[in-house]
């Protein structure tokens, strides 16, 4: 019997990689529902191949989608709109697995809906967990949802931890003999740039990651190291560990995806070629394994693997994220909202590359922190933080 999959963000890089895996295993998985934000022609091609029962697009894209469906004689797929539609498909009774791959804060409500519906949730949307934190983790426990990390680093950590680690007490302290998590970072395309060189970085340059094929937003986050900061916060929540037990290690080759150190002196690492199909397949099938077309790692190709500490003078975003995690409450929501606005402004060439962390720092300083008591207060603070960030960008000429 096949398992039914909902893919939130099907036309993004994670969504496309997920389809690749599902297409290789039609005896195990079927696509029940998908969502897309803007690439409607691509969505139609996906629908022709995988024949989902339901698709969700923004309200303003409904007419375009229905026109293309009519041209292709597609009449057996229901079309829903907006956040309400996303929540509907993520929590649908016919769905077994939800791939949460919508970029940014827009993925929060549907991801939480999937968790509250007790689904197997493959978490590729780190921002949802950065914002909701313990609310999301508590909901997973309350509704017996299985929250499995798809980010290559968190998936590597998950594979390197004791098999029952997620069932351990959530104390903020390492459990079951674990002493530390080593979160690897490629360092991005500007690892060896000077501060002066960073001031001249263009959006086109920032979107070319040396090792991974990714979307624009995560590529820029990777270049500023904010992606690693968001991943640090995500790791703290997923694995119930305080931020001072997480060390970021720059590893330019992206072969070791992360490591876990133990009290007996052991360090376990998960290694593999940099291809998102591997962690996606792992999360889909866990605790089983799926065949993929990803070539096995050939160690003889690599004469050496390099490691270094991150330069937080050149890349202050990492420390901003660590400070936000330490502050707790709504600080990570403020951090994430300001960063999304700053990255968007950079991609539109309204601000320079080095202004991105400045926008984030200003917004964190401007807004008062408070306890993250509910999803409503998180969304309210997200909205305010975006406004403050926009105002600051305008004030510096963006």
UniProtKB/Swiss-Prot annotation:
Names of the cofactor(s): Mg(2+); Mn(2+)
Q: Which Pfam families match?
A: DXP_redisom_C, DXP_reductoisom, DXPR_C
GO MF annotation list: 1-deoxy-D-xylulose-5-phosphate reductoisomerase activity; manganese ion binding; NADPH binding
Superkingdom: Bacteria
Reaction catalysed by this enzyme: 2-C-methyl-D-erythritol 4-phosphate + NADP(+) = 1-deoxy-D-xylulose 5-phosphate + NADPH + H(+)
| A GO biological-process term | isopentenyl diphosphate biosynthetic process, methylerythritol 4-phosphate pathway involved in terpenoid biosynthetic process
Is the Acetylation keyword given for this protein?
no
| Binding of NADPH, residues | 11-14, 125, 127, 215
The entry marks the following residues as binding 1-deoxy-D-xylulose 5-phosphate, namely: 126, 152-153, 186, 209, 222, 227-228, 231
Which pathway does this chain act in? Isoprenoid biosynthesis; isopentenyl diphosphate biosynthesis via DXP pathway; isopentenyl diphosphate from 1-deoxy-D-xylulose 5-phosphate: step 1/6
Q: Under which EC number(s) is this enzyme classified?
A: 1.1.1.267
Residues annotated as binding Mn(2+): 151, 153, 231
**Keyword vocabulary terms for this entry:** Isoprene biosynthesis, Manganese, Metal-binding, NADP, Oxidoreductase
Q: Which family does it belong to?
A: Belongs to the DXR family.
| Protein role | Catalyzes the NADPH-dependent rearrangement and reduction of 1-deoxy-D-xylulose-5-phosphate (DXP) to 2-C-methyl-D-erythritol 4-phosphate (MEP).
NCBIfam families, per the entry: Dxr, PRK05447.1-1, PRK12464.1
Its name, as the record gives it, is: 1-deoxy-D-xylulose 5-phosphate reductoisomerase
The opening ranks of the lineage are:
Bacteria, Pseudomonadati, Pseudomonadota, Gammaproteobacteria, Moraxellales
Q: What is the gene called? A: dxr
């Amino acid at each position: 019997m096949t398992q039914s999959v909902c893919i939130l963000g099907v036309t993004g890089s994670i969504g496309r990689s997920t389809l690749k895996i599902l297409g290789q295993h039609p005896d195990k998985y079927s696509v029940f529902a998908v969502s897309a934000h803007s690439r409607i022609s691509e969505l139609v091609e996906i629908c022709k191949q995988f024949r989902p029962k339901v698709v969700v697009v923004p309200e303003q894209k409904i007419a375009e989608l229905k026109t293309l469906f009519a041209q292709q004689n597609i009449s057996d797929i229901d079309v829903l709109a907006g956040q309400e539609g996303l929540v509907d498909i993520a929590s649908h009774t016919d769905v077994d697995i939800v791939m949460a791959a919508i970029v940014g804060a827009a993925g929060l409500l549907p991801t939480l809906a999937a968790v509250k519906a007790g689904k197997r949730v493959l978490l590729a949307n780190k921002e949802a967990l950065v914002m909701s934190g313990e609310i999301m983790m508590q909901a997973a426990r309350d509704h017996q949802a299985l929250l499995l990390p798809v980010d290559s680093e968190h998936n590597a950590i998950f594979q390197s931890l004791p098999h029952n680690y997620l069932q351990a007490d959530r104390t903020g302290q390492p459990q079951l003999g674990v002493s530390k998590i080593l979160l690897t970072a490629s360092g991005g395309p500007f690892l060896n740039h000077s501060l002066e060189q960073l001031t001249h970085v263009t959006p086109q340059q920032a979107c070319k990651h040396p090792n991974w094929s990714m979307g624009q937003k995560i590529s820029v986050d990777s270049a500023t190291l904010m992606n690693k900061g968001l991943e640090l916060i995500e790791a703290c929540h997923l694995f119930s560990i305080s931020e001072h037990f997480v060390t970021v290690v720059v590893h330019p080759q992206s072969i070791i995806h992360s490591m876990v150190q133990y009290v007996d002196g052991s360090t376990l690492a998960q290694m593999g070629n940099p291809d998102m199909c591997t962690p996606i397949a792992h999360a889909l099938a866990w605790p089983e394994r799926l065949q993929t077309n990803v070539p096995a790692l050939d160690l003889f190709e690599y004469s050496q693997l390099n490691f270094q500490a991150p330069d937080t003078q050149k890349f202050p975003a990492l420390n901003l994220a660590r400070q936000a995690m330490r502050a707790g409450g709504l600080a990570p929501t403020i951090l994430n909202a300001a960063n999304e606005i700053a990255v968007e402004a950079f991609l539109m060439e309204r601000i320079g590359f080095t202004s991105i962390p400045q926008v984030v720092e200003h917004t964190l300083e401007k807004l008062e922190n408070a306890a993250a008591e509910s999803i409503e207060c998180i969304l309210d603070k997200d909205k305010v933080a975006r406004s403050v960030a926009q105002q600051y960008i305008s004030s510096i000429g963006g």
